[in-house]
């Protein structure tokens, strides 16, 4: 395989498919949850389709019956929905297309572009070992491949055949990859691929080809672990007389340590990020920047991503997952969100903690807390100060801060507060008056106020906290000292 150092511009696909409406697809296998790499691939395919006013297709490749589960399918659909990447068509399920695959297989057998092979797995293994011993690439030797003047072995009576694709022997299969540039494989290096198993079920590479053909897919963006599949799929499409899609292969995502991203680096399941309190807007932004760029722009809306998306700006190099950068992006979106909308997203998380968001002014609470929060979970936890059941300060904390001097100042504050208008400015003025009259510094009243009213020594600005708790609650807690 050879790759060029430079990508030609303009790309071949910009003219080759100029008259074909853009149709992209995302085709996950439901053998597990949608992981970050898959989500990024889906995002690039979705953004490309949206940029070109095209169609984004969702296809579920569920032919691995033993490993595919309904739960995994639902998790994929939930993840796509959460990220706001709803397909224009689909989801389509490969298991519901078996009759179509059988029809195409029969046509290929009749046309001579596929053939039955009766070699046992052990015989094929022996062929490959023999090739290795000669220093050759291990491959099937074409024993059952029909050729003019060739006599095929007798058909074993007790063995069901596989179906192999009759791959071209001469020449090369080349394409101008949308990400990597020109790529070429010698056809002589490619096996006659098995496209149906002995029980008749079609294999992955065959199903993909038929699906892309039937669904009119014009552009395939996928992980670069599929590069070796591409020449095989191109040759099958050519044998079917199909118009080829354009292919682009994006590099993998690496963990912070430079190794392949895995569970040991933290969450890899997309919906775990929802549970941890990340906004889908932030995930879209961050995932897009993992392998794609628009100048120096780090932050952009979904609409800007669609407007700016260009495969020429996809990186050829692997990207590195950075949890701190994700937190920074998420914090940006939290700070910029309307308080009422943010409250709506945080309220269910408060309720799961046993809090009562409806009993407090949650939008105002969000306005107070959001500038220091990185996740919705952090916001929900901090909001429990206002929405949760009051827990008096631990004895040790109370003994440290609720001294006789502090209690006298708190009693003075409470007495004056009864006739004070309850807003942040008035509360701030009241605190300053008590400090001035008693010759105290801010920590000598501010910390005791926090401890007495919230049970904590550290909170956001004390005047803002007291305002949101309400005069009745504040006075009741001070009275209980």
Swiss-Prot record:
Keywords: Aminoacyl-tRNA synthetase, ATP-binding, Cytoplasm, Ligase, Nucleotide-binding, Protein biosynthesis. GO terms for molecular function: ATP binding; glutamate-tRNA ligase activity; tRNA binding; zinc ion binding. It comes from the Bacteria. Gene3D superfamilies: 1.10.10.350, HUPs (3.40.50.620). Residues 139-148 have a biased composition (Basic and acidic residues). GO terms for biological process: glutamyl-tRNA aminoacylation. Residues 139-159 are annotated as: Disordered. Its main location: cytoplasm. It is found in: Cytoplasm. Monomer. Belongs to the class-I aminoacyl-tRNA synthetase family. Glutamate--tRNA ligase type 1 subfamily. This is Glutamate--tRNA ligase. The gene is gltX.
